[in-house]
């Protein structure tokens, strides 16, 4: 499956050039943002870690081994890219124990930047946002057009697609999910089951969003829509009055799409019909999610880009800095600007 099939159309037109992303880890930097005041004491040791070329799960295993504790006592808020330079929090439960020597966990791929104590463990999804610094190298494109598009994106946001990495190489996770769904079975391994169910929900969401981008309604509330604020998981129905709420114009309030689960789409009118129609088109995946006991949730269709700035440190390098809510993908912003090409190759686009 190609990127257009997995995501959908761009909102702002064709790519304005080509570039390379992740030639080195420093080209893709992520800083986890937590809004948690630490107590300074308690049985949980919180660890601020910088890692490069290392996934979050492997970092957790290294911390557990160095601390001499079971892996289950190590927690983190979210998974971060392996092919990146990332800084994120971990917590280790150490009831009645002193701070362990964690130096054995460190090498050129993992550094412990600071530690503190807290009364609670780090929960999944506890981070409020992620800060990104991206360097698009070997950039070849129209800088004036890039600047104009970025100014527009800063004002209007972008479609909140799940990025292609959610679906595996060439959409392999979607293929696997469809295979399990056709057999009406679930993988026994918990991590595989979770990954494929998440893939299925993300794929259905992207299909709905793709249709809204195609008809120009992805950033416009319609009667029957379910609306949500940027950082809220709750939603409410849109009538005529809600469709002209000024908070829509300032990117505080957004229409939402389905993360499929039990029951019909809770939207109404034409929005309900669209969502039900797309789910019916993927009936095996829809029924598989329902039978797995997934509850219906919503995700905002429009992604506001916080603190967006950009400059060119070198003529062929475009550097972007911005903040996204947790669970959103930096690569969908890049996609609205340029086609990515493999390292060392700038004459043909790479679909991944």
UniProtKB/Swiss-Prot annotation:
SUPFAM superfamilies: Pseudouridine synthase. The keyword Isomerase applies. It comes from the Bacteria. Signal peptide: none annotated. The keyword tRNA processing applies. It is an enzyme of class 5 (isomerase). It holds the Pfam family TruD. It catalyses: uridine(13) in tRNA = pseudouridine(13) in tRNA. Keywords: Isomerase, tRNA processing. Its EC number is 5.4.99.27. GO terms for cellular component: cytosol. The active site is at 81 (nucleophile). Belongs to the pseudouridine synthase TruD family. This is tRNA pseudouridine synthase D.
